[in-house]
Amino acid sequence: MLLLSQSAQAQVQNMIVHRTDGTKVMFNVEQVDSVTFEEVPRWANRSVEARKLLAYLDEGAGKRMLSGVHACINYNTYEADWVYKHTGKYPAINCIDFIHDIYSSKGGWIDYTNQTIWKNWTNKRGIMAAMWHWGMPTNDGTTYTCTPGTADGETSFSPSAIFDPTSDGYKMMIQRIDQIATWMKPMAAARVPIIWRPLHEAQGNWSDQYPGTSWHKAWFWWGIDGPEAFVELWKVMYDRMVNYHGLTNLIWVYNAGDSMKWYPGDEYVDVVAFDFYNQSLSGTRQWYQFFKKNFPGKIYAISEFGNMPKISELWADGQYWSFMVPWWDNARTGDPNSEAFNSTDHNNANIDYWQDALKQDCIITRDELPNFR
């Protein structure tokens, strides 16, 4: 792994940020607050802390890859604790999921107002990330789900309501976005940057290559009406969270597919990511090359994965992803006090995978991060 002295961690000298026009600007992390938006236009509406993290990711392209984990289902550090238990190192990134937002209550079994998780993590210089399995009422009205369809346990909610601000659907979406923003505001007040990946995997099986096939459909309701409704929803969410709620600490991650029709636009996206499951080296290479061709100047990441090539193989192949975040394994990490937690097996990234990763000079763990605040 890349070893940084305390002084190097504090300074991170000679940061180079690539502009979308191909030119560059150089500075160090401590100088980010003096860089103007004319120099790096996409940093408009970004807090100093978010700019520092963006600069760190941008400058690190081809040199380092941040390690990360997804919290086991919702709001914890169980996966990170499992990695530490078996390797002695904490990943750099811990990603929470607002999947149970509708059930959150003060002091309840899920309580997103509880600041202990993110405070403990970021006080040790860890990076917080967040996503949202955004559930809508099921057709039978008994619960909430992300899965579109006409069955009782699916949802017929249409994202096209985003085009009509007077509709009940629009108002419901705004209300739910506002709730997530409310839980994020304490992090913004504490100057904590957040890697934010909303509306993930929107394209699903929609594909420009295979139109009209029986599986040509979205996996989640926010993609069911196609790219136009998705892009509008993304832009409305961005405006609501950044301009209305003032969440300038967010770094926006777009979960890409093979069609550029779904891309919200450079001004709304900081990181372009893909989710790999049971993927070969040639498969990950294909997507890396696609990103380089279609998203020049962006940061490229692996936002979810399970059973993909080792980091040593990716790096040797010239695939310089900025961060990687394996998906959780509830059977392994759902209960830190269980016997299963002691096992080195994992459905998506076992300890052999982690040991290979931690041997690589490019991999960054939590203890090696600079201070972004």
Stretch-by-stretch model annotation:
Residues 52, 75-83, 112-116, 182, ...:
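Alpha-helical scaffolding within the catalytic cores
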Residues 94-96, 259-281, 326-327:
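Aromatic- and acid-rich polysaccharide-binding/catalytic face
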Residues 61, 65-72, 298-373:
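Substrate-binding cleft of secreted/luminal carbohydrate-active enzymes
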Residues 68-70, 197-200, 234-260, 297-308:
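Aromatic-lined carbohydrate-recognition surfaces of secreted/lumenal glycan-active proteins
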Residues 62-65, 89-92, 123-128, 189-195, ...:
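Loop/turn elements at helix/coil->beta-strand transitions in domains of secreted/extracellular proteins
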Residues 18-22, 38-111, 118, 313, ...:
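N-terminal module-boundary/linker segments of secreted carbohydrate-active enzymes
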